[in-house]
Amino acid sequence: MTDPDRFKDALLAELQSLRAFAISITGNVERADDLVQDTVVKAWTNMNGYTEGTNIRAWLFTILRNTFYSDFRKRSREVEDDGAHASRLAVHAPQHGHMDLEDFRRALAQLPDDQREALILVGASGFSYEEAAEICGCALGTIKSRINRARARLGEMLSVTSGADFGPDADSYAALAGADAGGAKAD
């Protein structure tokens, strides 16, 4: 039998990670919050199904993932908001960097569900490849392949050609280089 107090503490410790993962797979904060709530209720109800000493984080993420796919099947007839009205209301500040966060979010949303999920579990949620494979219910090699394909596809969609695409733009880099050179002369 699982100790309710320790179970509650472990569950509460994972709420932020569960919410972040839920937001990333749903693309909608309200649905993500509902998904986390459903996950917590299911986990608490099935507390005795959890084996103490095993990875509670992986167990919770598996519940969340399974709940998401069950809800997805139920909501398959809902019409999604394409953001057309919101895009006319919001104006983004001019960016000097090569990559805008919204560009990344759009590209991430275009990945196949299995690739996006694998990438988020390992890249953003900090799970090992083995843990992600367990959560997704697939082989380790499958997770590695999904992540590799997701990274390659994101690179294509975002026109990333090198690591420099993630760093400062040319103007910022020149300013930083000039500051370094100026600092070296002062010595």
Task: Describe each region flagged by the PLM.
Residues 1-20, 30-33:
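A short, charge-rich alpha-helical start-of-domain segment used by transcription regulators
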